[in-house]
From Swiss-Prot:
Organism per entry: Sinomonas cyclohexanicum (Corynebacterium cyclohexanicum)
Keywords: FAD, Flavoprotein, Oxidoreductase
Name of this protein: 4-oxocyclohexanecarboxylate 2-dehydrogenase
Cofactor(s) required for function per UniProt: FAD
Biological process terms in GO annotation: steroid metabolic process
Physiological role: Desaturase involved in a cyclohexanecarboxylate (CHCA) degradation pathway. Catalyzes the conversion of 4-oxocyclohexanecarboxylate (4-oxoCHCA) to 4-oxocyclohexenecarboxylate. Is highly specific for 4-oxocyclohexanecarboxylic acid and shows only slight activity with 4-oxo-2-methylcyclohex-2-enecarboxylic acid.
Gene3D superfamilies recorded: FAD/NAD(P)-binding domain, Succinate dehydrogenase/fumarate reductase flavoprotein, catalytic domain
Similarity-based family: Belongs to the FAD-dependent oxidoreductase 2 family.
Quaternary organization: Monomer. Homodimer.
pH dependence text: Optimum pH is 7.2. Optimum pH is 7.6.
Pfam families for this protein: FAD_binding_2
Induction annotation: Induced by CHCA, trans-4-hydroxyCHCA and 4-oxoCHCA but not by 4-hydroxybenzoate (4-HBA).
UniProt-listed InterPro entries: FAD-dep_OxRdtase_2_FAD-bd, FAD-oxidoreductase_2, FAD/NAD-bd_sf, Succ_DH/fumarate_Rdtase_cat_sf
GO molecular function, one term: steroid dehydrogenase activity, acting on the CH-CH group of donors
Length: 574
């Protein structure tokens, strides 16, 4: 174990396992209330999955939207997330995530100095469901100067190497082809970071300012637990590390160790579908889940993950192969996705979580996969306009791209019937000319259009023909950002035992826990939004403070949010 901040101690009020956004929110919130806190990170780098994420938060009825004149209500948001979760989410967690999110946001801004940008037109992912809105619920961190915030610690925060720009700037610039790359290079040299790394940097700086200690290479192995169960006064009083070191917690241990996607035996035994790749840190091996299970914690939702279509391109993290998320590669006008039969099988522009589920389909009569192997297919003109991942036209074709001079040649190389691929492209090209996709309705929703090209010469920003050879294919596999089921908690982030009673002294947040939205993915930031809210609620509960936060500003929906939350949360407390 290496202390990066503070000197080693054997006892703290609060021990936080993990250093992602949920962990740091819990740590900073508790430290702000005067608690002594230590953050213990398993890896040598801080930030976990959060640091390499998009950094966005899905917060319904947030004050930024209200101040901009955007009309949103907790009622509408709850109706929406109930539909997105397909009836599988627990009402207590839904209420906590939806009605306490803005309290978390205002607390971070006013008490901890974390700053955010409001995205006015980033649509909810499922525009077809009741309660969805076409903007206002997603926010993102502002650009942050990580060197100014953290000094020498800046290099200890994970990075995915992305250029420092916000999604608001992406909207303003319109497409990657118009990015001011020289300006972005200058920003990076000046220490500016964006997205998840900016969020983690601001949260980490806040926790340190409030007195939290931080250590790395500190893998938790076992909880110190007195008693046989919640009904006999059992309590978690600390943690034993893999190194054998013991750290006592006088008030609480917070598990925020990430998911279990990198433990292949756990993933294969729990997830509903085979996970072929992921892009999270390899340290996400279910440590916190096992620790909690050993003392009788309840688990829920472990069949699910934050699914996403990915490709294997040779990217690595901590020396391990990872998947690369496919976004514009499948959403831009002039590309399609075909299955093992050479046919389109879904709206390629839909959100990544739902599209990945289409990769999981099984053909029972044939006893084989229905749609995989699957490939994104595009032509030379697409490559010249947009590039694909980091590859640009004129460069040698990378190994992960399959090239064919003609569609039949490409079909032979990817193992699909040539006549099907040719017919599929011809049919899609006709749709591109008219601007309508009667097969899968691509380009109809605000979400589809958001990720299209507003300058597309064809009628629909999401549709364009594939006409100019050579043609290219990129294999698509079922991937995930991480798992999103695990330790069950109540609406205050207290871990529940198998009988549904809170385990004293134990809290959990983040991907180590059951998702508030169950199998659903409401919109951009639906991972970080609720997990940071639960981190805030954990910190407030440990400190004996109210869940709500009043910064003295007028909040039109504050009473409404309280009215909605209190009955559900009060019932859970009983």
């Amino acid at each position: 174990m290496e202390y990066l901040v503070g000197t080693p101690r054997s006892t703290y009020d609060v021990v936080v396992l993990g250093s992602g956004a949920g962990a740091l929110t819990a740590a900073a919130t508790a430290a702000r209330a005067g608690k002594s806190v230590v953050v213990l990170e398993k890896a040598s780098l801080l930030g976990g999955t959060s640091a390499i994420s998009g950094g966005m938060l899905w917060i319904a009825a947030n004050h930024h939207a209200r101040e901009a004149g955007f009309e949103d209500t907790a009622d509408a948001a709850l109706e929406y997330v109930r539909a997105v979760s397909r009836g599988r989410a627990r009402e207590e967690l839904l209420a906590a995530a939806v009605t306490r999110g803005d309290s978390m946001l205002r607390f971070l801004e006013h008490e901890l100095g974390v700053t955010f940008i409001y995205l006015d037109n980033f649509p909810d992912y499922r525009q077809d469901l009741p309660g969805a809105v076409d903007g206002g619920r997603t926010i993102e961190p502002e650009l942050a100067n990580i060197a100014d915030l953290l000094g020498d610690l800046a290099d200890r925060v994970r990075s995915d190497g992305r250029a420092p720009f916000t999604m608001q700037e992406y909207e303003d610039w319109g497409a990657f082809t118009r990015f001011p790359w020289d300006e972005l290079d200058a920003r990076a040299k000046a220490g500016l970071v964006a997205k998840g790394r900016a969020l983690v940097a601001m949260l980490l700086a806040a926790a340190i300012r409030e007195g939290a200690h931080v250590a790395v290479e500190a893998r938790g192995e076992r909880l110190i637990y007195s008693g046989q169960g919640a009904d006999d006064g059992g309590r978690v009083t600390g943690v034993v590390l893999a190194s054998g070191e013991r750290i006592d917690a006088t008030e609480a241990v917070v598990i925020a160790t990430g998911g279990f996607e990198w433990d292949h035996s756990l993933a294969d035994s729990m997830l509903a579908s085979r996970l072929y790749t992921m892009c999270s840190p390899p340290t996400n091996e279910g440590d916190g889940l096992r620790m909690a299970q050993r003392i009788g914690a309840q688990t829920r939702g472990t069949r699910e993950a934050w699914w996403a279509p990915m490709s294997i391109t040779g990217d690595t993290r901590d020396g391990r192969p990872i998947g690369t998320l496919l976004r514009f590669e499948r959403q831009g006008p002039g590309s399609i996705m075909v299955n093992r039969h050479g046919k389109r099988f879904a709206n390629e522009s839909q959100n990544y979580n739902d599209l990945a589920r289409c990769l999981q389909s099984w053909d029972s009569p044939a006893n084989t996969t229905l749609n995989t192997p699957a490939h994104v297919v595009f032509d030379q003109s697409y490559l010249e306009r947009y590039g694909v991942l980091s590859h640009r036209a004129g460069e040698p074709t990378p190994d992960y791209l399959i090239e064919g001079a003609t569609l039949p040649e490409l079909a032979a190389k990817i193992g699909v019937p040539a006549e099907n691929l040719v017919a599929t492209v011809e049919r899609f090209n006709a749709f591109a000319v008219t601007g309508e996709d009667p097969d899968f309705h691509r380009g109809q929703t605000a979400y589809d259009k958001y990720w299209g090209d507003a300058d597309n010469v064809w009628p629909n920003p999401s549709l364009g023909p594939l006409e100019q050879g050579p043609f290219y294919a990129l294999e698509v596999v079922n991937g995930a950002f991480g798992t999103n089921g695990g330790i069950a908690t109540d609406g205050a982030a207290r871990v529940l035992d198998v009988d549904g009673a809170p385990i004293a002294g134990l809290f959990a947040v983040g991907n180590a826990t059951e998702s508030a939205y169950a199998a659903g993915y409401p919109g951009a930031g639906a991972t970080l939004g609720p997990l940071m809210t639960m981190g805030y609620l954990a910190g407030r509960t440990i400190a004996g403070q109210a869940a709500g936060y009043d910064d003295g500003a007028a909040a039109a929906s504050a009473a409404e949010l309280t009215d909605l939350a209190e009955p559900v949360l009060a019932e859970a407390a009983r």
